[in-house]
Design a protein with these regions (language model features):
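Bacterial N-terminal signal peptides
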Residues: 2-12
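Bacterial signal peptide processing site
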Residues: 14-15, 19-20
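N-terminal "mature-domain start" segment
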Residues: 26-51, 96
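Short small/polar-residue motifs
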Residues: 45-53, 119-126
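Mature extracytoplasmic domains of secretory-pathway proteins
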Residues: 45-48, 54-110
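Extracytosolic low-complexity repeat regions of secreted or lipid-anchored proteins
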Residues: 84-143
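Active-site-adjacent structural elements in enzyme catalytic domains
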Residues: 146
Length: 146
């Protein structure tokens, strides 16, 4: 039996029943790719967004983690379309985004803020952002089952 660490919890997982995939985004990510991933996580990424990477875990959590960077000027509109209450963001990782691994690096963020939102069908959306750089906002998205 293997152990998978997701969102700070150790989850037992049979090798056959749980599949983890992580990949760095290809150099040329199309707008169609971003739209598809956006639909999967419930967030409309702007055309200016750059996909940094995607990680999926199939199994008990059916988790997807996505890191995107977008121009700071596009952040307010993106946030207004997200299914979260912006006033609920709090400083720090708070156990919502899990450990750093490869492209996934919320613990290296200069000014990380996070929020958790309950979604229909027992799903959860954890959203974090780092606006510590003047012109770019890094967005960390984790969608998983409760």
């Amino acid at each position: 039996m293997a152990m998978v660490v997701a969102i700070g919890l150790a989850i037992p997982c049979e090798n056959v029943a749980c599949k983890s995939t992580a990949k760095q985004a290809p150099r040329q990510t199309t707008q169609q790719d971003l739209e598809s991933i956006g639909k999967e996580v419930g967030l409309p990424f702007p055309p200016s967004a750059k996909l940094i990477g995607v990680h999926r875990e199939r199994g008990a959590d059916d988790l997807i983690a996505v890191k995107v960077e977008l121009p700071a000027k596009d952040w307010p509109v993106f946030l207004s379309l997200a299914p979260v209450d912006a006033s609920l963001f709090r400083a720090g990782e708070r156990g919502l985004l899990g450990p750093d691994q490869g492209f996934w690096d919320p613990h290296k963020a200069q000014n990380l803020r996070t929020v958790e939102a309950s979604l229909p069908n027992g799903r959860v959306l954890n959203l974090g952002y780092d606006d510590g750089r003047a012109s770019v906002v890094a967005v960390y998205v984790v969608k998983h089952s409760k």
